[in-house]
């Protein structure tokens, strides 16, 4: 019982995932055959941050998505990390629900475009966990 309590206390310190990120993960699953985890630490831009020149088409998808989120920051009150939106998935088709909320529409379009891009881009296992200092100039 003590171990369970300690375990639960430790889990309480884990921050919740942003809802928008969860929606993006679900879109990736809808559009393609790879899980969202396949894109963590891929190339120079897939995952947190990014620098240099994208290494391939898939990495360019991540680069474009990063820049799309940067543009969303210019919409008053729009926070890409927490803003949610509505969409439908009929695999592999994703449709953003029409809304008057400019931020929600913009973010849904960013995520939809990226998910479709991921699904259509070749996946090169040699671009996983590459050295940013060597490959992302």
From Swiss-Prot:
Pfam families (UniProt xref): Phospholip_A2_1
Entry annotated with the keyword Lipid metabolism: yes
Entry's family note: Belongs to the phospholipase A2 family. Group I subfamily. D49 sub-subfamily.
Molecular function terms, GO-annotated: calcium ion binding; calcium-dependent phospholipase A2 activity; phospholipid binding; toxin activity
Keywords: Blood coagulation cascade inhibiting toxin, Calcium, Disulfide bond, Hemostasis impairing toxin, Hydrolase, Lipid degradation, Lipid metabolism, Metal-binding, Neurotoxin, Presynaptic neurotoxin, Secreted, Signal, Toxin
Cofactor: how bound: Binds 1 Ca(2+) ion per subunit.
Active site: 65, 111
Prosegment residue ranges: 12-19
E.C. number: 3.1.1.4
Top-level taxon of origin: Eukaryota
Binding residues annotated for Ca(2+), in chain numbering: 45, 47, 49, 66
Lineage of producing organism: Eukaryota, Metazoa, Chordata, Craniata, Vertebrata
Disulfide feature: 30-89, 44-136, 46-62, 61-117, 68-110, 78-103, 96-108
Recorded catalytic activity of this chain's protein: a 1,2-diacyl-sn-glycero-3-phosphocholine + H2O = a 1-acyl-sn-glycero-3-phosphocholine + a fatty acid + H(+)
Tissue specificity field: Expressed by the venom gland.
PROSITE patterns: PA2_ASP, PA2_HIS
Species annotation: Bungarus caeruleus (Indian krait)
Listed cofactors: Ca(2+)
Stated name of the protein: Basic phospholipase A2 3
Physiological role: Snake venom phospholipase A2 (PLA2) that shows anticoagulant and neurotoxic activities. PLA2 catalyzes the calcium-dependent hydrolysis of the 2-acyl groups in 3-sn-phosphoglycerides.
Localization of this protein: Secreted
GO biological process, one term: arachidonate secretion
Subunit structure: Monomer, or homotrimer. Was firstly described as a trimer, but has been reinterpreted with the possibility of being a monomer.
Matches recorded under InterPro entries: PLipase_A2, PLipase_A2_Asp_AS, PLipase_A2_dom, PLipase_A2_dom_sf, PLipase_A2_His_AS
One GO cellular component term: extracellular region
Signal peptide, first to last residue: 1-11
């Amino acid at each position: 019982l003590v171990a369970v309590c300690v375990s639960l206390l430790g889990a309480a310190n884990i921050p919740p995932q942003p809802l928008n990120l969860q929606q993006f993960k679900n879109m990736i699953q809808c559009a393609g055959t790879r899980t969202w985890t396949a894109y963590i630490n891929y190339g120079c831009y897939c995952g947190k941050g990014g620098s240099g020149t994208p290494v391939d088409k898939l990495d360019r998808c991540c680069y474009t998505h990063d820049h799309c989120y940067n543009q969303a920051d210019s919409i008053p009150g729009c926070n890409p990390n927490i803003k949610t939106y509505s969409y439908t998935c009929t695999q592999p088709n994703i449709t953003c629900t029409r809304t008057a909320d400019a931020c929600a529409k913009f973010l849904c379009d960013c995520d939809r475009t990226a998910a479709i891009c991921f699904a259509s881009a070749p996946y090169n296992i040699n671009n996983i966990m590459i050295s940013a200092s060597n490959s992302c100039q």
